[in-house]
UniProtKB/Swiss-Prot annotation:
Residues 4-185 are annotated as: Large ATPase domain (RuvB-L). The RuvA-RuvB-RuvC complex processes Holliday junction (HJ) DNA during genetic recombination and DNA repair, while the RuvA-RuvB complex plays an important role in the rescue of blocked DNA replication forks via replication fork reversal (RFR). RuvA specifically binds to HJ cruciform DNA, conferring on it an open structure. The RuvB hexamer acts as an ATP-dependent pump, pulling dsDNA into and through the RuvAB complex. RuvB forms 2 homohexamers on either side of HJ DNA bound by 1 or 2 RuvA tetramers; 4 subunits per hexamer contact DNA at a time. It comes from Hamiltonella defensa subsp. Acyrthosiphon pisum (strain 5AT). This is Holliday junction branch migration complex subunit RuvB. The gene is ruvB. InterPro entries: AAA+_ATPase, AAA_lid_4, DNA_helicase_Holl-junc_RuvB, P-loop_NTPase, RuvB-like_N, RuvB_C, WH-like_DNA-bd_sf, WH_DNA-bd_sf. ATP binds at I24, R25, G66, K69, T70, T71, E132, D133, Y134, R175, Y185, R222. Residues 259-333 are annotated as: Head domain (RuvB-H). NCBIfam families: PRK00080.1 (NF000868), ruvB (TIGR00635). Pfam families: AAA_lid_4 (PF17864), RuvB_C (PF05491), RuvB_N (PF05496).
Amino acid sequence: MIEIDRLVSTDVLNENEALVDRAIRPKRLDEYVGQSHVRDQMQIFIQAAKQRGDALDHLLIFGPPGLGKTTLANIVAHEMGVNLRTTSGPVLEKAGDLAALLTHLEPRDALFIDEIHRLSPVVEEILYPAMEDYQLDIMIGEGPGARSIKLDLPPFTLIGATTRAGSLTSPLRDRFGIVQRLEFYSVPDLEHIVSRSARCLQLPLTKNGAHQLALRSRGTPRIINRLLRRVRDFAEVKGEGKINTEIAIKALEMLNVDKEGLDYMDSKLLLAIIEKFQGGPVGLDNLAAAIGEERETIEDVLEPYLIQQGFIQRTPRGRIATQHAYQHFICGG
């Protein structure tokens, strides 16, 4: 329902953002910043598979949106020297959709399924023998005369990505030989990421300017790259194209993104709890009515980061604004 353009949203990129994102996306593991536990493990797994001449084990990547699951899938395929075919769970409506992709894979190729938790049960059933035995079971005909035939598939790697690992069925989850969780990024890692992005886009960005962007990026590369693009516009008009501390702070203030990465929607929610409901507890329906949003928007879009950062607590009686929330507004955000 929500129809607002939030800079701190982790929503999928629009077409223009996606074009820029592809230009700045790292291609190799040695360019991949942060997630050192993932990078070190994948380096070993990839090297071992290449030495044996095998396809890499099936890989499940999970974690919050915007942390680079698609980027990692592309890096894995590049490091393995294989093709990557890309699709998503909602797109694969029929078993035949998946069969068409699987039968066109070359040996050791990778198939990337984003939002794999949204696969239909019918399509998921096709995946089981494909992942385990590199075989495709296809039903020919209908009714009493229907028969099953098996097609051999070349060894391949399935790379699944999801924000909801808990929504995967056990049979599917258990067929992934490698499971990697992506964590939120530290401020130093985000500074490194945005500095690299600025170099790729030929934008002058100072170290302190990068720090200001990193502080407001909610631990998420997708957000920091989006902020960089918008601050660039401000810098070109107000700062001769250079992004330093002063320009970064002024631009982000104009864009209503404060030093903890909260935007006007976050502030609106927190101030409603504090001012209209004396800090809570307040039920979700009352809160939704107070700020003019749907309860699903609050639950799925606004609340997760505020809870994670300790601004809100969920209780059996409703939402409560924490001391951290009060302090945030006392100190001016």
